[in-house]
């Protein structure tokens, strides 16, 4: 005879509901603390998940900022979140309290894909020994293989010439520039990680770029947040591997490429690229179970550097070309400065920047206006801290609304317009603003910032030295409103290229 009857089901349901409500209250008790940031009222069990606008989170956060101020709180299921808006709040958290806010929140979706505590890569790694070890290694290795040296500048310049040749083949017909930009930028980071470049029609490069685009789509939206906030759902067999199939495929493909390079490694010779250098560290660390130099992390660090090194720079260059066809007067001024300083025959060099204030200002304004990582990468407090007078307890996820800094009406004269004069003084000299932080700030500032700056200047000036860009005849003017996933990318558009 069954134990659950009509007479027992009702009381049991009530008991379960009361228990869950008590658990929910226990998780939310921090909201009652003095000086905890205000925020919208959460719904039991799911918090503010159902209220979030995952398609336009920047607009949603702007509305909440208007209601609650520059520091407000959310509850994503049982995950406490504090959103920081405006220069003062973001700078205080990331720079002045960087030791308290340098951690990353746990990401159960990645743990479920088989990544262990010593194999978290770089960008989502928890703040601690393993992260310090890998950041130190990556910075020193990138320097050893050319970052800050003439050799890397030559790699970028040579790749820019290949890119210009590919653009020249498109002359006379409309085309979308994103695919070619992805390939060119990928080859720069590939030279550092794999010691080689790919031909633009190489099947493996095309596969890697396609998987990267899929991964970016999978890595945003409601489902990702729901699975991270309610990780018990990840125990549904096969769910994580299916929902995040592109990430798994990238790991597999990266591992294949790593193994191919390891077969040609001569241990008696200096390392040829980052993979060789990492393998040397694995050999040195043998017998140490706590080291972050292991086979799994080799794959994670390599894929982290490749994806981050490619995506952000290529998207920024796509924004640059879009804004040039929308603002032909700015394009002409950049070309005039290139002609006066470099000429049309000599290749651009990084040393030219000091004599090209308008071009440098345009590149900075592209980054500000494009605002490609509007919400940054999430941080987490590693101990109780304060921001703008609010108490933020240990273990709170922090979202740094970088868009609110790059578009702050108190800082920028025309925050929602493309206006290179933001970075020029009255005499036409370049000036940099403290509110310019597209690479974030503090201890977790993007380690690839110097490389990105080099690529942006050299690719952009090479392209505008060789070509003029325009909206294709008969096509409507493209929109300069971006499309948000995890990143903010231009809506699909085409342009025409004309050799100068």
From Swiss-Prot:
Signal peptide: none annotated. One of its GO terms (biological process) is arachidonate metabolic process. Keywords: Endoplasmic reticulum, Heme, Iron, Membrane, Metal-binding, Microsome, Monooxygenase, Oxidoreductase. SUPFAM superfamilies: Cytochrome P450. Heme binds at residue 446. Its main location: endoplasmic reticulum. It is found in: Endoplasmic reticulum membrane; Microsome membrane. High activity for the hydroxylation of bunitrolol and imipramine; low activity on debrisoquine. Belongs to the cytochrome P450 family. This is Cytochrome P450 2D15. It comes from Canis lupus familiaris.
């Amino acid at each position: 005879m069954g134990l659950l009857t009509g007479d027992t089901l009702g009381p049991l349901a009530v008991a379960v509901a009361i228990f869950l409500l008590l658990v929910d209250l226990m998780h939310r008790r921090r909201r009652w603390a003095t000086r905890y940031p205000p925020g919208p009222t959460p719904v039991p069990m799911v918090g503010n998940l159902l209220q979030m606008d995952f398609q336009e989170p920047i607009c949603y956060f702007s509305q909440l900022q208007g209601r609650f101020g520059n520091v407000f709180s959310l509850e994503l299921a049982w995950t406490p979140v504090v959103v920081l808006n405006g220069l003062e709040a973001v700078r205080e958290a990331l720079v002045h309290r960087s030791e308290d806010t340098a951690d990353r929140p746990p990401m159960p979706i990645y743990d479920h894909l088989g990544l262990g505590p010593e194999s978290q890569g770089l960008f989502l790694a928890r703040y601690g020994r393993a992260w310090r070890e890998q950041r130190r290694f990556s910075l020193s290795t990138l320097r050893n293989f050319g970052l800050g040296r003439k050799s890397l500048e030559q790699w970028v310049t040579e790749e820019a010439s290949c890119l210009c040749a590919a653009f020249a083949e498109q002359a006379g017909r409309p085309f979308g520039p994103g695919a070619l930009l992805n390939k060119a930028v990928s080859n720069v980071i590939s030279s550092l990680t794999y010691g080689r470049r790919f031909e633009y029609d190489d099947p493996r490069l095309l596969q890697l770029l396609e998987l990267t685009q899929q991964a970016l789509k999978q890595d945003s939206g409601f489902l990702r947040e729901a699975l991270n906030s309610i990780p018990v759902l990840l125990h549904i067999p096969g769910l994580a591997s299916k929902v995040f199939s592109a990430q798994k495929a990238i790991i597999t493909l990266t591992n294949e490429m790593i193994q191919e390079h390891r077969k040609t490694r001569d241990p008696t010779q200096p390392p040829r690229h980052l993979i060789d250098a990492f393998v040397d560290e694995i050999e040195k660390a043998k017998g140490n179970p706590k080291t972050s130099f292991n086979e799994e992390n080799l794959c994670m660090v390599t894929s982290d550097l490749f994806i981050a090194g490619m995506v952000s720079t290529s998207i920024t260059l796509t924004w640059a070309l879009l804004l040039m066809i929308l603002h032909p007067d700015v394009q002409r001024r950049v070309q005039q400065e290139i002609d006066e300083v470099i000429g049309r025959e000599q290749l651009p060099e990084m040393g030219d920047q000091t004599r090209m204030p308008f071009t440098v200002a345009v590149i900075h304004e592209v980054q500000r206006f494009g605002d490609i990582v509007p919400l940054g990468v999430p941080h987490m407090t590693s101990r109780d801290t304060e921001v703008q007078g609010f108490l933020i307890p240990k273990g709170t996820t922090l979202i740094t609304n970088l868009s609110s800094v790059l578009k702050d009406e108190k800082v920028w004269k025309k925050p929602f317009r493309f206006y290179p004069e933001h970075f020029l003084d009255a005499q036409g000299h370049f000036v940099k603003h403290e509110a310019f932080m597209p690479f974030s700030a503090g201890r977790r500032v993007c380690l690839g910032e110097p490389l990105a700056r080099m690529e942006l200047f050299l690719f952009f000036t090479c392209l505008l030295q060789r070509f003029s860009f325009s909206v294709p005849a008969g096509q409507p003017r493209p929109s300069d409103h971006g499309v948000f996933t995890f990143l903010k990318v231009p809506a699909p558009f085409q342009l025409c290229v004309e050799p100068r």
